[in-house]
């Protein structure tokens, strides 16, 4: 049984690996065309660097080990976002807007969802140095454009704002334990539990917290929220920011969910989640996390998104494409060798058989090179 992998870890076999690689190139090329520069952080870092500003969920998902050189505790990254924030704040040190993108494996102690693995291939983009809502809109459009490029339709994009709950909790004077309890109930939309937990919260904040799970749907939710929630400055600003996103990108399938508080201890502004048919959870997540670089010397405005490319690859419809071309062993035949090289230059996959090899068990070959007279031509391989 030595060949068994640990639970929720899997090999990517040739067909899946090829599909993932095509998607990776397509998405990174899309990011590059929008001015996002690629960075490649290491898999391992000192634990305090990986977990700076992170919530408790990321701490629990991070594998930990001892560095044999320094004796310090290290972590295997569970999220590349903090690493990108470190690069922006400490290494690049740009004064204006910085646009970064990345793609790499991360490792989780537990799967994030019932359908996810423990080694996602995380691909994403981050924008630093701009505090306005226009940056959030730019990142959301970048995400939507990536799905357009890989031809995976987005059914809806949920918008939320963690500042609304934070303002209510602060105004109500909730102690940390009570805030965490209410937060958990909101995330699961447990209305009876929420009513019970808020029983001793002063009015009007009690009613406002209890209303949050019902504040989801179309653009009209913002008007309902403005009428039903206390007119706290932070809430007014949050609703105005969400309204700006709806107006700024009417072509996108936006919906509002004011109780969506994923990443509450990490995000501090707009949050968003993209959903597509055939997948039970969000396929991409993002939001604003201003100040993430503070521990690295510079507190910068920041917003971005990421997704698991392995999960995305399972949802993308693969179009029919030509298989490989099977070629005989060229040996000293310079004419055949040149013809094979020319086909490869044209983008064809050509499998040249080794001396004595009669068939190829690798890429699916649907054509072959055959000598007709003095010329090598491509013929279809007839199935028996």
Swiss-Prot record:
Biological-process GO terms, alphabetical: L-histidine biosynthetic process
Subcellular localization: Cytoplasm
Cellular component GO terms, alphabetical: cytoplasm
CDD domains given in the database record: HisRS-like_core (cd00773)
Pathway: Amino-acid biosynthesis; L-histidine biosynthesis; L-histidine from 5-phospho-alpha-D-ribose 1-diphosphate: step 1/9
Presence of keyword Amino-acid biosynthesis: yes
SUPFAM superfamilies recorded: Class II aaRS and biotin synthetases
Pfam families in the record: tRNA-synt_His
Record's keyword terms, sorted: Amino-acid biosynthesis, Cytoplasm, Histidine biosynthesis
Assembly behavior: Heteromultimer composed of HisG and HisZ subunits.
Stated family: Belongs to the class-II aminoacyl-tRNA synthetase family. HisZ subfamily.
NCBIfam families: PRK12292.1-1, PRK12421.1
Chain's role: Required for the first step of histidine biosynthesis. May allow the feedback regulation of ATP phosphoribosyltransferase activity by histidine.
HAMAP family, per database record: HisZ
Note: This function is generally fulfilled by the C-terminal part of HisG, which is missing in some bacteria such as this one.
Protein name per its UniProtKB record: ATP phosphoribosyltransferase regulatory subunit
Gene: hisZ
